[in-house]
Amino acid sequence: MASLFGDDGVDDLFNDNIPTDPDQLPSDGEGEKLFADDEDNGVEPGSQDAQIVEPKKRAVRNPRPRLTVETLRGPRGIQTIEDYFKDIKFKGKGYEKTDLDEVLRRLQHWGHRMYPTYTFDDVLNNIERLGKKKPLQVHMARYRLGQLEQMRAHEAEALEEAQDEQQEGAGDEPFDEFDALLGEQIAMSRLAPPSPQQWKMSTASSNSTLATPSFSRGNAVMSTPYSGVNATFDRSGASVAPAFDRNGAPLASMDISDYGQPLPPSQPPTPAAKKLSNEQMARIAENRRLAQERLKAKQQQESGSKS
C-alpha cells in the first residue's frame, strides 16, 4: 500500500544513483576534493619547488667556562691540591680549630683558582657529582699510582710528532712559479755589482770624494779624472802622458789630488784612443803646414795661367 505522503516516490528519487554492486562504491581515497582549485594552483608539500627553512643556529661568541671532568683533570685540577699543602705546619694539640681553618683556607684557594665563578660549597657539590664519572675515576687511579707524569710525557711526544707531520705536509706544497721567479730575482740582485749610488753610500765613511764612472759613446770616450798627485793614471794603473791641444800646446792639468778611486764600471769599457807622443804631434803639425803651402802654390799657378 502506498504511503499517503508518497514516501515511496521520495525513496526512489534518492536511491536512483546508488549502485547495486558494493564494489562500485567509491573508496576512502577517491572522495571529492575540497577546494580543488586551490590545490591545483598551489604547491604540493612533496614537490621540488618547496623551500625548506633551516632553523637558525645559535652561535655562542663568548662561552662561559664550565666545571667539567676536563677541568678537574686539567693543569689546575685535583692533582694540584698537594702543591698547596707543601709548606703547611700544624700547631698540634690545643690548636685543632686553627689547623682546620688553615686546611679549609688552602682548599678554598685551590677551588677559587680552578673555578672562580662558584663558591667553595658549589665547587664541592659539583666535584661530588662529577666524581661518579668513569674518566675522573681513571684519572684519580693513575694519580695514585704515579702514572700522570708518564701520560703527560707521551702526550707531549704525540704533540711534537703531530707538529712535525704538519711541517712536513707544509713542505710538500705545490711548486709556485711566482715564488721561484721572485727568489731568482733576489739572488741575481745579490750577485750583481753595486750601483754607483750603493757604492757611494758604502764608502761615505772613508771621507773620500768619488769620481763619476766613465762611459763610452761610439768612438768618443769620456773619462773622468782619477786619483793622483802630479800624474794621471789609466784603469790599469799605468801613467798616462799629458794631453795636447790641436796647436801642440799642453792642456791645463786639473788638480785631482782630492779625487778618490774610480768606480768599478758596470759594463766592460770600450778601448780608449791611443795617445800621441810629442814627436808625432810635431810631425802632424809639420805635414799640415807643408800641405797648406802646396795648396797655396797650386792655387797661384792656376790663377796665373788663366790671366
Swiss-Prot record:
CC terms in the record's Gene Ontology section: chromatin; cytoplasm; nucleus; replication fork protection complex
Pro residues: compositionally biased ranges = 262-271
Enumerate the residue ranges of region (Disordered): 1-50, 252-279
Q: Which GO terms describe its molecular function?
A: DNA binding
Give its localization.
Answer: Cytoplasm; Nucleus
| UniProt keyword terms in alphabetical order | Cell cycle, Cell division, Cytoplasm, DNA damage, Mitosis, Nucleus
- Any one GO biological process: DNA replication checkpoint signaling
List the Pfam families hit by this protein, alphabetically: Swi3
Claim: Cell division is one of the keywords in the record: yes
* Chief place where the protein resides: cytoplasm
Induction of expression: By E2f.
Instruction: Give the PANTHER family listed for this entry.
Output: TIMELESS INTERACTING-RELATED, TIMELESS-INTERACTING PROTEIN
Task: Name the protein family.
Answer: Belongs to the CSM3 family.
What does it do? Required for normal progression of S-phase. Important for cell survival after DNA damage or replication stress.
Q: What is this protein called?
A: Protein TIPIN homolog
